[in-house]
Amino acid sequence: MPTFKLVLSDPISGKARQFEIKDPLAQRFIGLKIGDELDGSVLKDFLELPKGAKIRITGGSGIEGAPMHPGVPGPVKRYILADGPPGYWPPKRGMRKRKLVRGNTISDSIVQINAVIVYPQGYSGPPAIPLGAKEIEKLTKAKEGTPA
């Protein structure tokens, strides 16, 4: 019985929202890979997405905190020699380090899934994850020319 935390990002508003996904909806995510898209209507209980919107899986992390890596096939846990993101940001150019990562496939051992909303072509409506009151206030002050 898998349970996931889905972190859904909205490219229009720049905001992200976290949802807890439980069975039977969680079963729809099992077996998906990084880069796969699924219909946005699966989240109708949590968020109202525009018609035709999709959700693209961009990553995630396992129980132990290891990030999912798009270059490691399957739902496995492996050590890789990393020279850059995801999973390792070298302090100097050319440095490499052996890091533990998860594969690119979602399984029961994944606890967090990162995803982004893919809007239909030519969409010009409001964002699915709206700005908060403080952000709107900052934007209106900046537009008027007064310091925030």
From Swiss-Prot:
Keywords: Ribonucleoprotein, Ribosomal protein. The keyword 4Fe-4S does not apply. GO terms for molecular function: structural constituent of ribosome. Belongs to the eukaryotic ribosomal protein eS6 family. Pfam families: Ribosomal_S6e. PANTHER family: 40S RIBOSOMAL PROTEIN S6 (PTHR11502). HAMAP family: Ribosomal_eS6. GO terms for cellular component: ribonucleoprotein complex; ribosome. The keyword Flavoprotein does not apply. One of its GO terms (biological process) is translation. It comes from Pyrobaculum islandicum (strain DSM 4184 / JCM 9189 / GEO3). SMART domains: Ribosomal_S6e. This is Small ribosomal subunit protein eS6. The lineage of its organism: Archaea, Thermoproteota, Thermoprotei, Thermoproteales, Thermoproteaceae.
